[in-house]
Amino acid sequence: MAKKNEETLRCSFCGKSQKEVKKLIAGNGVYICDECVSLCNEILEEERFEHLEGIKQDLPTPQEIHKFLNDYVIGQERAKKILSVAVYNHYKRIFKGTSSDEIQKSNIMLIGPTGTGKTLLAQTLAKFLDVPFAIADATTLTEAGYVGEDVENILLKLLQNANFDIQRAQIGIIYIDEIDKISRKSDSPSITRDVSGEGVQQALLKIVEGTLANIPPQGGRKHPQQEYIQLDTTNILFICGGAFVGLEEIIKKRIGKRTIGFLSETKKIDEENVLSQAEPEDLIKYGMIPEFVGRFPVVATLNQLDEDALIEILTKPKNALVKQYQKLFSIDGVKLTFTDDALRAIAKKAIERKTGARALRSILEDIMLDVMYLIPSERGINECIINEDVVNKKASPILIYKEKKVKHA
């Protein structure tokens, strides 16, 4: 009789019999099968990400991410490809419900000279994915208890940018700039306190690897009595960037030791692309602690920008500087034209300043100041032409009036 009753037990939700399912869990007069339990878990998981504006359903592919980056970032093709794959894998890991124990988080280290687009890449990724984004400067950070910013303040910035929506903040992106500036003074462990170097790396470790952090909503040091907000950093993507001046020499030294007898043949290749051959041991030699390096499995290097790349940056991206100035002039009814030799002269000046694309805006502001001061008050101007002589301060911008009159500003 007991056997007969056992055979007729059915799931109270789907009606399947005990024989049709793997497990049948009994409650007080009700039963639920393993299939219905799985379905309930899926529904709960969907509700968990409902407020994240469809990013789970519409997670872009690496190619789609790369294509969007191309609209705003010129060159750096390999870095863009590495970032696209890493970001895709990171969010796939979150939204496909994979256990964090199975797949390591794809935190990213960007290595490259000043003005090569490290910050822009991180900003553009966050914009495309529509996730909260925060930028921090590693040079302002110190260990807790010392003058400076606590590492938890980075998380506070992210939380503020997410309008204190904890769930959104927990899938955000944090970019830490100047990370090379917190390298320890030597590659051997220090017996003295290094509160802005190794100490900061140790403090960052906790939030980078994933922890339940206590965030002071008004900043940590001035309001010690406030209540804390808990933020899980497990699914926050950390991107660190730095110029790592001097890293090339460390890499060359390592490669030189390994290629004795072949050095003359490989030297040219090494010189052209040294940073791309960076290994974790090089970063450790530079002064990053092994545990910190280990938390950034993805390393992308960015190349110094040449004249052609800088000209493209001036003209091609959706938010290119030349396009911005042309839009400003068009509001006053004036067409703004930059000649090819003017663009090349601007690129040369930027290279001379050794700050990459970062120099372009200040150079343009200097060139355009006088004419932007004049045009709103001057009637009848149809076109403004900027040529090489204008860039090099040998002439004023050429103004063409509607009655075909030409005048220098």
Swiss-Prot record:
GO terms for cellular component: HslUV protease complex. SMART domains: AAA (SM00382), ClpB_D2-small (SM01086), zf-C4_ClpX (SM00994). ATP binds at residues 113-120. Keywords: ATP-binding, Chaperone, Metal-binding, Nucleotide-binding, Zinc. GO terms for molecular function: ATP binding; ATP hydrolysis activity; ATP-dependent protein folding chaperone; protein dimerization activity; unfolded protein binding; zinc ion binding. InterPro entries: AAA+_ATPase (IPR003593), ATP-dep_Clp_protease_ClpX (IPR050052), ATPase_AAA_core (IPR003959), Clp_ATPase_C (IPR019489), Clp_protease_ATP-bd_su_ClpX (IPR004487), ClpX_bact (IPR046425), P-loop_NTPase (IPR027417), Znf_CppX_C4 (IPR010603). It comes from the Bacteria. Signal peptide: none annotated. Zn(2+) binds at residues 11, 14, 33, 36. The keyword Chaperone applies. CDD domains: RecA-like_ClpX. The keyword Chaperone applies. Belongs to the ClpX chaperone family. Component of the ClpX-ClpP complex. Forms a hexameric ring that, in the presence of ATP, binds to fourteen ClpP subunits assembled into a disk-like structure with a central cavity, resembling the structure of eukaryotic proteasomes. ATP-dependent specificity component of the Clp protease. It directs the protease to specific substrates. Can perform chaperone functions in the absence of ClpP. This is ATP-dependent Clp protease ATP-binding subunit ClpX. It comes from Thermodesulfovibrio yellowstonii (strain ATCC 51303 / DSM 11347 / YP87). The lineage of its organism: Bacteria, Pseudomonadati, Nitrospirota, Thermodesulfovibrionia, Thermodesulfovibrionales. The gene is clpX.
